[in-house]
Amino acid sequence: MDKVTDNSPDVESTESTEGSFPTVGVDTGDTITATLATGTENVGGGGGAFGGASESSAAIHATAKWSTAQLKKHQAEQAARAAAAEAALAKAKSQRDALTQRLKDIVNDALRANAARSPSVTDLAHANNMAMQAEAERLRLAKAEQKAREEAEAAEKALREAERQRDEIARQQAETAHLLAMAEAAEAEKNRQDSLDEEHRAVEVAEKKLAEAKAELAKAESDVQSKQAIVSRVAGELENAQKSVDVKVTGFPGWRDVQKKLERQLQDKKNEYSSVTNALNSAVSIRDAKKTEVQNAEIKLKEAKDALEKSQVKDSVDTMVGFYQYITEQYGEKYSRIAQDLAEKAKGSKFNSVDEALAAFEKYKNVLDKKFSKVDRDDIFNALESITYDEWAKHLEKISRALKVTGYLSFGYDVWDGTLKGLKTGDWKPLFVTLEKSAVDFGVAKIVALMFSFIVGAPLGFWGIAIITGIVSSYIGDDELNKLNELLGI
């Protein structure tokens, strides 16, 4: 019997190593190899051997500091990797299918070879020889089947890895797109702040010039008063000198010399009076000029304050428009409309008590938890943990200013801490107690500002924004919660 050789393709699969980017299913002719392309570090998420359970907070923060140009370049690189991953996936699937079919063919051959048949007379005569040949054939087919099975299993593993890689790249692309949007928003915010800072500086300069003008006016006014006192004194002395000259005393030796001396003194006083009067007039002119400068400085200050107020109003409008646009882009127009409704209704003074709000929220959340998995909840918690309190407070300041809410810092940290604890432990009451205190002091608009700041501060996902808007809605009324339920299909 001719020797049958097995020419089936070998399948190799190299394990992914930390800090490497796996590219599976690369066809090298006779083998399928799962190779590693280095260069993508700290890529997390999705579990498995690739990169750990999730991307670290430090990595997210580092990427978040990139410029828009860096993020766009990163996007292009990710797109190229995504295309390569799709090609690798298709190749891996094709190889898997081919090797699976080969395994089926070998198994069928083995079954046919092992099928019982009636021995002929010749077969019986050569039973020993036939038994040896049959055993050799059985061993060959068993070996071929084992090899084909291993190849098929390796191909299946390569296919699963290619699919996982494709999904991971898609997740990274979504994350990069979000970071790019946030970076572009940050750049726009910096430009806006620079413009606003110029207007703040204009007010400060105008205030400084007004203060300087007032100081100069006060100095000029003091100088006028001082010179008025001098003029008054010299005028009295002049009057006395005039009286001395007018009263002529004669009949004693040297009276003419005395008279001439008095007349010289009178002339000196007249000259002095003329001089101090001129000085007073000059001081009055300077004072009047300083008054004009103060008036002009007051006008400039008013203009600067008007310009600042106009920018702040525009800034407030732009902030909320940008906020609603962000929600629309990230979560859809219906969510944006709900957010606008909440902001509008927050202008009223009526709101539910902490017990009413908490009961409504818990009922809403229990239904919500059935729709979203623990993985979704962990993702939102990790997203919030990746944002520092100081970063969140910046968003809170903008939204509070846009909604004309003050005093937020006194509650800010308690709300931040209460939200994280609620997500982590499921105990939301401390947060609701803090929010009620805030609403009592500043109105329900404060709750809206506090909670909306979470939406723009972190990539929450649908479960996260549903929780945040649910908290706000529970204070305002059942109508808003019903809208959320309808939107989420729960």
Swiss-Prot record:
Gene Ontology MF annotations:
pore-forming activity
Membrane-crossing ranges are: 447-467
State where the protein is found. Host membrane
- A single GO BP annotation from the record? defense response to Gram-negative bacterium
**Database matches in InterPro entries:** Channel_colicin_C, Channel_colicin_C_sf
* Compositional bias ranges of the Polar residues kind: 1-20
**In its keyword annotation, does this UniProt entry include Membrane?**
yes
Task: Give the UniProt keywords, A-Z.
Answer: Antibiotic, Antimicrobial, Bacteriocin, Host membrane, Membrane, Plasmid, Transmembrane, Transmembrane helix
Ranges of Basic and acidic residues composition bias in the record: 146-170
Region Disordered: which residues? Answer: 1-29, 146-171
The parts of the chain that form a coiled coil are none
Q: What does this protein do?
A: This colicin is a channel-forming colicin. This class of transmembrane toxins depolarize the cytoplasmic membrane, leading to dissipation of cellular energy. Colicins are polypeptide toxins produced by and active against E.coli and closely related bacteria.
Please give the name of this protein.
Colicin-10
- According to its UniProt entry, this protein's organism is Escherichia coli
Name the lineage.
Bacteria, Pseudomonadati, Pseudomonadota, Gammaproteobacteria, Enterobacterales
